[in-house]
Amino acid sequence: MNGKPAQEGTPIRRGDTISTGQNSDAIYVLGDNAFFQKADSRVDFGKSSAATFLRVLAGGLLSVFGRGKSHLATYSATIGIRCTVCYIQAEERRSYFCLCYGAVVLQPENGQTVRYKTTHHERPLWIENGATSPASVVNHTDAEIIMLEEFAGRSSPFPPGGSTY
């Protein structure tokens, strides 16, 4: 975290950056939100309450959010969510977004705002150059979502064991 190794229980504060290495993942819980940060990823937490809650700068982040509004961002989109589970994978020129379940307001950079709801991975997207295009479900599983929901003190609507894609 912030260029130094983190230990279990290390607090995460506004302005912190969490990076994972090639063979490492990180799981962290902030209030009623839980996150599974994949290998080779970098996530930046906003510096003020007016800032974006978190920005996925590189790699993948599976997130489960409790009640209330949250905002995420990548280089190619700003994402407003509420009581939602999503997976984001940020690449240099494009981003992958899967609304696993919940509701989203998606604003691609220089593109039109898209609002939608899903119940089970119905609309994964690539976001690039202000446009969205259909995608397959990649790099996250129902079992990971079930695990994160348990860390956040909730149960998932998916059956135990979940699906793999």
Which functions belong to the PLM regions below?
Residues 1-17, 21-165:
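Flexible, surface-exposed loop/linker segments and immediately adjacent secondary-structure boundaries
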